[in-house]
Design a protein with these regions (language model features):
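Residues in well-ordered beta-strands of folded domains
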Residues: 6-8, 27, 76, 90-94
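Ferredoxin-type iron-sulfur electron-transfer modules in oxidoreductases and energy-metabolism complexes
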Residues: 32-47, 89-319
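Short strand-turn-strand beta-turns centered on an Asx-Gly dipeptide
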Residues: 27, 67-70
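Eukaryote-biased recognition of intrinsically disordered, low-complexity regulatory segments
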Residues: 1-24
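Structured interaction patches on ligand/partner-binding surfaces of diverse proteins
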Residues: 71-84
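Short, contiguous acidic and Ser/Thr-rich linear segments
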Residues: 22-33
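Short, structured protein-protein interaction patches enriched in aromatics and acidic/basic residues
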Residues: 50, 55-64, 249-254
Length: 319
């Protein structure tokens, strides 16, 4: 088959460094992956092309790149999958990380986030002389986050990191969950307290991008939601994120639908005047245009609200 690649390149040593695209048209076997095609280009067409790869078997996580605007491991992405009709395949370096050259990014940003969550066991007691035996059922819950290969695809896809590079990010938070949920670790409370701060677990916008691009099914966003549950179960409820959850649940349980005005007020805090004033005009314009339900005492119950309330009550009784 004939493959068409459009590679975004960058040479820091050029007279005028800057990103540009370069097209390659090559003949390759039908079974080739995007990585196979890139290696073919580097070996036979253009030895100046820089890329990072190693195992070529979806194990090491080295070859994460952006293919047609989606973060992927290029070693497991077949050309026929992304270009079934011979379309041009756009290959770019990962997003949200500094490009060193061509398709190679600086991973210091990624590893800095991982180090920030202290990704190692901190036993609650003295280190045992023998093996620390953990219950099977406790460890089964950790199989998913332990499958992470640190490829960084989720970091590349994270929409929060695009606008706020202080956010810990999906990979680091998924790794944090792996130790918070480990019964052998003795610092769960301190870990949760740290993750409860700004740029931690509450800054995720639940866009699902990290879930979609993860090649190992770790589903970082779901791990972040479990961290939020653990934070609240640990009694840390005096944050905007925790208040947002409680206000949302209270509104739907009592009226059958969301009181968006009180959600904002409760989340920021009724006495947080600067935040409330900063959002007042937005709320007013939304209300005038009919896009905001009547707030507070004017927020009427929906028909069937009692049934919704019973669902909430039944769920709470099971907890």
């Amino acid at each position: 088959m004939q493959a068409k690649l459009r590679v975004r390149r960058y040479d820091p040593e050029a007279a005028e460094p800057g990103p540009y695209t370069q097209d390659y048209q090559i003949d390759v076997p039908d079974h080739y992956t995007v990585l196979d095609a890139l290696i073919h280009v580097r070996e036979d067409e253009d030895p100046s092309l820089a890329l990072r790869c190693s195992c070529r078997a979806s194990i090491c996580g080295s070859c994460a790149m952006t293919v047609n605007d989606n973060a992927r491991l290029v070693c497991k992405t077949k050309l026929t999958e992304v270009a079934p009709n011979g379309e041009t395949v756009l290959v770019e370096p990962m997003n949200n990380q500094r490009v060193i050259k061509d398709l190679v990014v600086d991973l210091d940003f990624f590893w800095g986030k991982i180090r920030a969550v202290e990704p190692y066991l901190q036993p609650r007691d003295e280190e045992p002389e023998g093996e620390y035996i953990a219950p099977n059922e406790s460890m089964l819950n950790l199989l998913t986050p332990m499958g992470c290969i640190m490829c960084g695809a989720c970091v590349s896809a994270c929409t929060v990191l695009e606008v706020d590079d202080t956010f810990l990010g999906p990979a680091a938070l998924a790794k944090a969950y792996r130790f918070v949920a480990d019964p052998r670790d003795g610092e769960a409370h301190q870990r949760l307290s740290t993750l409860n701060d700004a740029s931690g677990a509450w800054d995720c916008t639940r866009c699902y991008q990290c879930v979609q691009v993860c090649p190992k099914g770790v589903a970082p966003m779901e791990r972040i939601m479990e961290l939020r549950d653990s934070i609240m179960e640990d009694g840390m409820t005096n944050t905007a994120g925790a208040r947002h959850v409680e206000s949302f649940a209270h509104s739907v349980a009592h009226t059958g639908w969301l009181d968006e005005t009180m959600l904002a007020v409760d989340s920021w805090g009724k006495f947080n005047v600067p935040k409330l004033m900063g959002n007042a005009m937005l709320g007013f314009r939304t209300l005038v245009r009919g896009k905001l339900p009547a707030p507070g005492p004017f927020h009427k119950k929906r028909p069937g609200a009692e049934k919704v309330g019973r669902i909430f009550k039944r769920f709470e009784e099971k907890q």
